[in-house]
């Protein structure tokens, strides 16, 4: 039998997993990748790209980075880590809106966006509902003894 090396942190399918199952390295890498792409938004704004187009570019190239595989780590994020991820979107909106930016909540409303936390929460709920509806997973979820239905229900 071949001996395996011990590693403190490992990358698997683009997600960093640490030996203590904290998500600090993964959160750091998400922030690093997202902020490295922010310069693209800044340059495009400088040359006069519209707010609508900048928002589309943000959603495609930056928000997708923050949401990749979020179902696997959302419930385990610390408040500090969640805040760091939210700061990415806040910073992007400040760049995109410029002088029109008056606050994060107003910017979200103006752009028709939700907080990243709310989006991750919805994705987790959607994932849980899909799991309960899959016939192969029925045995994993207990039935309510009164109604003989599963505890997890639709929205």
What are these regions (language model features)?
Residues 1-155:
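Hydrophobic/basic alpha-helical segments
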């Amino acid at each position: 039998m071949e001996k395996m090396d011990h590693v403190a942190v490992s990358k698997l399918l683009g997600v960093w997993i640490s030996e203590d199952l904290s998500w600090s390295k993964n959160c750091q890498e998400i922030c690093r990748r997202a902020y490295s792409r922010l310069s693209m938004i800044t340059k495009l704004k400088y040359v006069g790209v519209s707010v609508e187009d900048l928002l589309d570019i943000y959603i495609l190239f930056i928000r997708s980075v923050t949401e990749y595989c979020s179902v696997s780590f959302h419930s385990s994020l610390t408040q500090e880590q969640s805040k760091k991820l939210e700061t990415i979107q806040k910073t992007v909106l400040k760049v995109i809106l410029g002088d029109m930016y008056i606050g994060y909540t107003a910017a979200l409303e103006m752009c028709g966006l939700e907080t990243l936390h709310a989006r991750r929460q919805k994705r987790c709920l959607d994932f849980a509902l899909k799991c309960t509806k899959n016939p192969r997973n029925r045995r994993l979820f207990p039935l309510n003894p009164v109604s003989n239905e599963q505890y997890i229900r639709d929205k």
